[in-house]
Amino acid sequence: MQLILLSSLLLLGLSLANGHETDPEGQILNSLVETVGRLEKKIDKVENAFLTVHRARSFGSGSERLYVTNKQVGNFEAVRNTCVQAGGHIPSPQLLNENKAFASVLERHNKAAYLVVQNSAKFTNWAAGEPNNADGNKLCVKADAQGAWHSASCDEDLLVVCEFSFI
């Protein structure tokens, strides 16, 4: 579709460059209008399909955020880089239902994963005795397989889970 649009634009450009000030019969312009119309319809279909899939994936959790793993493990920086490259970020659940959706991924894989806790967070899910950085080297936060939060070393290799917000 992009090739057709580019070809039409090229033809229009060549026509104008060869001294044709207009498209006398409107063929090139009409072709461009039709192509743009078809592209708009396809974009609408893709958007609707995407939203349908997103709603279906988030239906059980009630969360507008999607939590996905590639089943790899890594330290905090590696997880952050992986998530950024994928267009997401390290999970930062803001609500109970978001933490449940995040925890469901961890429970399926029976592993812990990093998360980011905002300073202004209204929701937290700290395990008993947490946060605890008594030894001074637990500068990160991880969620266990049940979704409870713990202080953690940023060097631990944990499950890569990324959060994607689409809406």
UniProtKB/Swiss-Prot annotation:
Disulfide bonds: C83-C162, C140-C154
Protein name per its UniProtKB record: Phospholipase A2 inhibitor alpha-like protein
Species of provenance: Elaphe quadrivirgata
Record key words, sorted: Disulfide bond, Lectin, Secreted, Signal
GO molecular function: carbohydrate binding
Subcellular location: Secreted
Function text: Does not show any inhibitory activity against various snake venom PLA2s. Does not inhibit the endogenous PLA2 activities in various tissue homogenates prepared from this snake.
Family assignment from sequence similarity: Belongs to the alpha-type phospholipase A2 inhibitor family.
Residues of the signal peptide: 1-19
GO cellular component: extracellular region
